[in-house]
Structures are given as structure tokens and as C-alpha cells.
Amino acid sequence: MSQNHTILQSLPVGQKVGIAFSGGLDTSAALLWMKLKGALPYAYTANLGQPDEDDYNAIPKKAMEYGAENARLIDCRAQLAHEGIAAIQCGAFHVSTGGIAYFNTTPLGRAVTGTMLVSAMKEDDVNIWGDGSTYKGNDIERFYRYGLLTNPALKIYKPWLDQQFIDELGGRHEMSEFLIANGFNYKMSVEKAYSTDSNMLGATHEAKDLEFLNSGIKIVKPIMGVAFWDENVEVSPEEVSVRFEEGVPVALNGKEYADPVELFLEANRIGGRHGLGMSDQIENRIIEAKSRGIYEAPGMALFHIAYERLVTGIHNEDTIEQYRINGLRLGRLLYQGRWFDSQALMLRETAQRWVAKAITGEVTLELRRGNDYSILNTESPNLTYQPERLSMEKVEDAAFTPLDRIGQLTMRNLDITDTRAKLGIYSQSGLLSLGEGSVLPQLGNKQ
């Protein structure tokens, strides 16, 4: 196997090493370990509007205490909101179960983090980057791609790929003891039955007990909304209106938001009151192994429902079909860490220019528990939905007459005749047979 010189398998002593620092046990221990082993760690923390983070400003201070040469907090929220809206406009969601989608909130967060943190590192002349992703997951590849796209001279050093680090600090207990031994009164948080990763767009709960499919959504404590499955949690029906202008969500309940970050936060609050957007998915990781996750995305779900309602009321069938096909493909590219690749940009351009630009209007919904909702009203100056065209009542100046329909049906005789001929061929060859007691063609028993 050829050696990848971009990935450093041992600590680059004496060199600047940027680390994506969360302030948790793993990155705290890694930063201190790198410092004591002779590297020059620089800490970078992304403010992604994580709903489970109370004090972002405290994180860089903590990094300095653990030995960082410098620590910076990078505000990524505006860019994350921008990419979230782009995903809504393109329907870039390929994982779904029973019609309920996973809104690719973690891949969107990685696209923003991977580019903005590495860009900040370039400003500090830091060309080696490490983060906490493991070799079995998706993030190691996503960060690898986005990092090198942003800085082609980038080298990758991950403590979790360094055998010396693994031997010395291979587990949470060892990392905690290491911090205590070096004078830091670190108290391990109580471990949950699963791990959580979040940003402003959504939360991901996975691993540990959730790896077992007989552990359901009920073991999860939502961080962006309510446990709607709990009968003791009071959830009242609520009407909400969402307004779009040229594909961009701009108002909730009649209130306009100039700041997309505030818009998402309010959408999260509204949807979260009902548990909207929670889903349980089995998905294929980039390496084709299957994983399972419980997801939250109340704001994304609210915007997606309203946007697609307008899409179906404004665009024709072929456009909608292409939007859905392209969205599935784009969602997979996003999941794989290819959000800025040329094929993804091509699909994004198609949807944002030719689909989203026409999406102006307002949708009113009633939200109940979980993903239970009703659409109460749809308004748009661009609607091609015109009920008089198909009215069962007698109307003046009808769009077409009975004679027109007779002519249209007569033209169908051409393909009906062709289809009947093909069915005869299939029947003669044994591919189709008439089932017992049935006049409908059925697949034959021949192998």
C-alpha cells in the first residue's frame, strides 16, 4: 500500500498543529498531550449555534489553560444558515424512512466547519490540522476533503490515528486520569446511553445503546424540542405560517427576519415545541457499512414542509420529478463530503435557479405532536394550481371540452395497442401468465 504523505501518523514535534477544539474530554486531553510531547497546538472552536452549548466564549479560555499557543472562536452560524437554506431549496436529502427525511444536518455542519476552521488556520500559518473524528465514521473523510479543498498544503494529524496516543490515552478513563495527574481537576460527565452531536440546524444521537435496533427513540432526551411520545408532555396544537420569497424563507407568523440565524432559531423553537422533524434512520455510511441514528431538526422540517408545498403548487410535474431526482443525488454528495464538488454545484445551481426562484408565497400549517401536522392554507402569486380547470361544476370558458378529451383518449389507442402486443409476446414466452381466477397478467413461474 502506498503511503499517504498528507496524513501524519506521528506527532509533528516542534510544529504548529491546529485542533478543532470542543472543550470536551477527548480534545482537552489531546491538546494537553500534544503540548507536553513538544508540538505547538493551536485551538479553533466553531460556533455553530449548538443547542447544548451554554458558553462558547469559555471554550477558547479552556484551551489556553490546557496549553494552546492560541485559541480562537470562529462564528460559523451565518454560513451554516446559508447552507441550510440551500439544502432546503434543493431538497438535498437522500435518507428517509416512511417519508420522514433526515435533513443532513451533520454533513452541512461539517461542510461549514471544515472550510471555515481551516481558512482560519491559514491566517495563522497553521498547516497541520487535527480533529476528533474516528477512522470508522464519515467525518474523517468529510474533514479530509473540505480541509484539502481549502488549503492544498494541509497536512492531517489525528491523535486518534497515532498509535502512541492510543497506547497512552486509549479510553475516557485514561484521558481523565491524565488530566488529573497534570493538575487539572477534570470530572468526567456522566455518560449517556448514546452520543450526541449538534449544530443550529439539527442534532444527531447515535452509538452505544442506539446501535441496538431494539432500543428506540424513547431512550433519547431531545435537546431541540419535546419528547412528543411521552403522554405526560403537554403539546398543544399550534398554527404557524411560513413565507418564502424567491426560495428563501423570510418570515414566520408574519414576522420578517433579516438575519437568517435568528430565523432558524425561531423556527427551531416553533417546531421544537411539537417534536417536529425527529426521525429514526438506518443509513449507509460513506464506507458502505450501515449505521443507525436518531435525528432532530425542527426548523429544517418546518421549512421543508412549507417549501415543498409551494413547489408542488407552482411547478409542473416534470420539473418536480427532476427536482426530486436531483435532490436525492445531491443529498448523497452532501453526505459524502462533496457539497462543493463540481457535480454538486451543478445540481445546486439547477435547483436554486430554476426551482427556487419561483417559490414565493406563504403556507399555513397546524402542528400537533411529532411529525403530525395539517396544511391549512397555501398562497402564492405563482401558483399554477387553478381549481376551475378541473371543477366538477359547470363553468364558463372551460379549459377543455368533452370532445377534446375524446380526441386525447383516441390518441392513447396507439400506445395501448403497442402494450397489448408486448403482453402477448411476454405471455407466449412464458414470462407472463393469467393467474387462476384472474384476468390480470402475472409473472410466470419460469426461472
From Swiss-Prot:
Q: Which residues form a coiled coil?
A: none
Q: Where in the cell is it found?
A: Cytoplasm
Tell me the Gene Ontology biological-process terms attached to this UniProt entry: argininosuccinate metabolic process; L-arginine biosynthetic process; urea cycle
Q: Which domain of life is it from?
A: Bacteria
Record flagged with keyword Oxidoreductase: no
In this chain, L-aspartate is annotated as bound at T134, N138, D139
The yes or no answer to whether the keyword Membrane is present is no
* Pathway(s) annotated for this protein in UniProt: Amino-acid biosynthesis; L-arginine biosynthesis; L-arginine from L-ornithine and carbamoyl phosphate: step 2/3
Q: Which family does it belong to?
A: Belongs to the argininosuccinate synthase family. Type 2 subfamily.
Q: What is this protein called?
A: Argininosuccinate synthase
Provenance organism: Neisseria meningitidis serogroup C (strain 053442)
